[in-house]
């Protein structure tokens, strides 16, 4: 199989689809890998590293897309749509429930698109999303602490406080991978941390994990309002695989927050959980202020720590990439049900229910679309 690794063009996206070691594994399995010039430079992998791993370095963006399978990090941008072709396997993060134009382009060009974030194991865990959820969660507490500083628009609060001064209050909505990792860092900074989740069993697990050092609260509209308005930092970390994020925090709740408080919307790439995160921001211009509250809505948070993120992502995605390359997508889907759940579009059909519902499109199951 011929595989392409393009350079990411999203604002300040410095990750790359595969590390040199990942490329080497594919080449050793008999595949041809084309890597776009400087694709790995943001993660401090040089072209020579990829060449030594067996890749062919190509300068033309069109050439790296003229392959059997493209492995990326983030969803293609509009300038990349012309490279779509029937039968192309696209393996990347897609978050299509918030990307109607991209979804339509994939359907129109009959692309076989496999989204990292919807590959799901029998225990409902998301193996290709988890590493980036860990990174984004940990970053969210660090970023929140940074933007609480007065010089960054915040109210000038130190999350850990000092003796005789209250700690900063951090509320995390969602107790999954991202929320749990946000809590780890916020606790490490010395903050007063509350996690809200809809699953009582998960709250019990979190209470055990943190030894009672975090407040665990059932998530419902009344509790969300109560804790949001008294918080210095609110982190949104709710995920419904493949579907748009629910708008759990209303504009009225935001209006009740203190001036200079901060919200971090980790779920912004799926539409966000705050009614007031009505636009996606970038690492170049990460925040805006609305109702006196600092809003951080960067959709590719892990892109700011690309070396760590690329290596973590490569560890998770490579076994699936090898499976797709070695077996072909049909046999790979037949033999690995979790991977088949990653299929979002197939030759003109939407094969993810959450995406189909988001845009009122016709849904076909993977088995029906592929006649498995």
From Swiss-Prot:
Q: Which UniProt keywords apply?
A: NAD, Oxidoreductase
Coiled-coil ranges from the UniProt annotation: none
Q: GO CC annotations?
A: plasma membrane
Gene3D superfamilies named among the record's database cross-references: NAD(P)-binding Rossmann-like Domain (3.40.50.720)
Q: Name one GO biological process term.
A: L-alanine catabolic process
Source domain of life is Bacteria
Q: In which pathway does it act?
A: Amino-acid degradation; L-alanine degradation via dehydrogenase pathway; NH(3) and pyruvate from L-alanine: step 1/1
Sites binding NAD(+) sit at 169-199
The record's section on InterPro entries has:
Ala_DH (IPR008141), Ala_DH/PNT_CS2 (IPR008143), AlaDH/PNT_CS1 (IPR008142), AlaDH/PNT_N (IPR007886), AlaDH/PNT_NAD(H)-bd (IPR007698), NAD(P)-bd_dom_sf (IPR036291)
List the molecular function annotations (GO) for this entry.
alanine dehydrogenase activity
Active site located where? 95
| Reactions catalysed, as given in the entry | L-alanine + NAD(+) + H2O = pyruvate + NH4(+) + NADH + H(+)
NCBIfam families in the record, alphabetically? alaDH
Relate the protein's function as given in its record: May play a role in cell wall synthesis as L-alanine is an important constituent of the peptidoglycan layer.
Q: Which PANTHER family match?
A: ALANINE DEHYDROGENASE
Protein name per its UniProtKB record: Alanine dehydrogenase 2
| Native source organism of the sequence | Staphylococcus aureus (strain MRSA252)
Its organism's taxonomic lineage begins at: Bacteria, Bacillati, Bacillota, Bacilli, Bacillales
Gene designation: ald2
């Amino acid at each position: 199989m011929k595989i392409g690794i393009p350079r990411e063009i999203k604002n300040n996206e410095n990750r790359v689809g595969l590390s040199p070691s990942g490329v080497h594994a594919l080449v050793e399995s008999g595949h041809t890998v084309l890597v776009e010039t400087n694709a790995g430079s943001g993660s401090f992998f040089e072209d020579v590293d990829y060449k030594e791993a067996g890749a062919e370095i190509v300068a033309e963006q069109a050439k790296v897309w003229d392959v059997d399978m493209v492995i990326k990090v983030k969803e293609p941008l509009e300038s990349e749509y012309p490279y779509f072709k029937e039968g192309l396997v696209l393996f990347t993060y897609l978050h299509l429930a918030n990307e109607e134009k991209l979804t339509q382009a994939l359907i129109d060009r009959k692309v076989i698109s496999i989204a990292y974030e919807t590959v799901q194991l029998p225990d409902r865990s998301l193996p290709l999303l988890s590493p980036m959820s860990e990174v984004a969660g940990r970053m969210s507490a660090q970023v929140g602490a940074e933007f609480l500083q007065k010089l960054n628009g915040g109210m000038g609060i130190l999350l850990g406080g000092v003796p005789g001064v209250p700690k900063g209050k951090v509320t995390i909505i969602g107790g999954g991978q991202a929320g749990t990792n946000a809590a780890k860092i916020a606790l490490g900074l010395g903050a007063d941390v509350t996690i809200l989740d809809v699953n009582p069993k998960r709250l019990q697990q979190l209470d055990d994990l943190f030894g009672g050092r975090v407040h665990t609260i059932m998530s419902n509209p009344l509790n969300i309002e109560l804790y949001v308005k008294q918080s210095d930092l609110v982190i949104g970390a709710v995920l419904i695989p493949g579907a748009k994020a629910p708008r759990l925090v209303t504009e009225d709740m935001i209006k009740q927050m203190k001036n200079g408080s901060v919200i971090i919307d980790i779920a912004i790439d799926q539409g966000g959980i705050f009614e007031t995160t009505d636009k996606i921001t970038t690492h170049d211009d990460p925040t805006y202020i609305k109702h006196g509250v600092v809003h951080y809505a960067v959709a590719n948070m892990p892109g700011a720590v690309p070396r760590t993120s690329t290596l973590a992502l490569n560890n998770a995605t490579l076994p699936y990439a090898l499976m797709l390359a070695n077996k072909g997508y049909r046999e790979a889907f037949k033999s690995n049900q979790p991977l088949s759940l990653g299929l979002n579009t197939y030759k003109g059909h939407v094969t993810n229910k959450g995406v189909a519902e988001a845009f009122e499109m016709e849904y076909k199951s993977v088995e029906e679309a592929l006649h498995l």
